[in-house]
UniProtKB/Swiss-Prot annotation:
Pfam families: Ribosomal_L23. Part of the 50S ribosomal subunit. Contacts protein L29, and trigger factor when it is bound to the ribosome. Keywords: Ribonucleoprotein, Ribosomal protein, RNA-binding, rRNA-binding. The gene is rplW. This is Large ribosomal subunit protein uL23. GO terms for molecular function: rRNA binding; structural constituent of ribosome. One of the early assembly proteins it binds 23S rRNA. One of the proteins that surrounds the polypeptide exit tunnel on the outside of the ribosome. Forms the main docking site for trigger factor binding to the ribosome. Belongs to the universal ribosomal protein uL23 family. GO terms for biological process: translation.
């Protein structure tokens, strides 16, 4: 019986800088509620970014301590362009939970 091998890490084609990972903050009514009550912040992120990439980018750019990162891949919506049906691009969202002593001020 052979030993179970751990999975090999996935090699990425490109390395992303912190400012390339976080594309923009998502400021919505629900996001502002999360920021004030639960100390959680939402960002639109690069589609190839991992949770570890997002954690390092937020800690580097905002000088805060990240406890948890949750990610979602959102499907693009169907949109009409005159008489043709098109689609918007798929995008990725991250919800970042911070340590209770830390805040991001622009929300």
């Amino acid at each position: 019986m052979s030993a179970i091998q751990p999975p090999k890490p996935v090699e990425r084609k490109i390395e992303l800088e912190p400012h390339q990972i976080l594309l923009k903050p998502l400021v919505t009514e629900k996001g502002v509620h999360r920021a004030t009550r639960n100390n959680q912040y939402a960002f639109q992120i690069h589609r190839d970014a991992t949770k570890l990439d997002v954690k390092k980018a937020v800690e580097h750019l905002f000088d805060v301590k990240v406890l948890k990162v949750r990610t979602q891949t959102r499907k693009g919506k169907a949109r009409r362009f005159k008489y043709k049906i098109g689609r918007t691009s798929d995008w990725k969202k991250a919800i970042v939970s911070l340590h209770e002593d830390h805040r991001i001020d622009f929300f």
